[in-house]
Amino acid sequence: MIGIIDCGGANLKSLTYALERIKLKYRISKVWSDLSNSRALILPGVSAAGNVMSNIRKLALEDRIRDFNKPVLGICVGMQVLYEHSDEENKTCLGLIPGVVKKFSNPKLAIPHMGWNMVNFLTSEFEDCSGHFYFA
């Protein structure tokens, strides 16, 4: 079973639809005892890093997520809070991934980027993966 952490603001309907299409069982909860036996966690989010971290702390999930020792997938801002810090609202995050989430500073980039675009990988280990990808 996949545990989906409901910390508010996420598009859970789209996520659960995707999991159902690939026939994965899941449970959505804000309560750790419902999620602790999951084989993996998904942390979705639509909001700002500060809001998501505030909700995680209110639900007493911060240390639980850190100590989970199984795969954790972050989607959208859920991915951002897996890092150590976010410059958005200057927030300390979960620290599962070393690094800081920073705003793109190039004014020529359209942010957020939506639609198809070519992706070219700079390392040889991913060169066969280059191609067109859809960004949402």
Residue ranges and their predicted role:
Residues 40, 71-73, 132:
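Structural signature of beta-strand start/N-cap positions in the alpha/beta core
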Residues 2-24:
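N-terminal beta1-alpha1 ligand-phosphate binding loop
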Residues 42-44:
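Structural motif
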Residues 1, 26-37:
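Short acidic low-complexity segments
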Residues 21-29, 54-56, 116-122:
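Short gly/ser/thr-rich secondary-structure transition/capping motifs
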Residues 67, 101-136:
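Amide-donor transfer/coupling interface in amidating biosynthetic enzymes
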Residues 47-113:
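Cysteine-nucleophile active-site neighborhood
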